[in-house]
Amino acid sequence: GWAAHYHQRYRRFSTDFAASVENAGKIGATLTRNGETSSLDPDASSRLCRLICAAGAGKVQPSCPQGEPLTVRYHSGAVLDLWEVEIPEETAKNPTGVFVRYTFADGTVYQYDTDQIQMNEVRLALGLH
């Protein structure tokens, strides 16, 4: 059913994401923030992957937020965009969270928001200040 379809899509995302990160461990990835691009350390890339995957499947969203995301580009062709967002649900663990948009190498997009992680945790994982 519906839930299984979402779970399947999440599985595809997390599997592909992990593969991109593993690949990046050998070749590296780039990080773009505030218009500046730098190379991303494989350890930072792995920490970010663990953080995002540990948060589990969030709430799939039809559109992404305004503003400049923090972008990680993997050599697999996949792109990860992250935004800090407000989580309006009253049941949310935190009033803010992270919006994740993952674009597969084939152009397919999987995007969701989660209150399980915060942008400062993302910055810490990436070694940003």
What are these regions (language model features)?
Residues 1-129:
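Function-determining sites in protein domains
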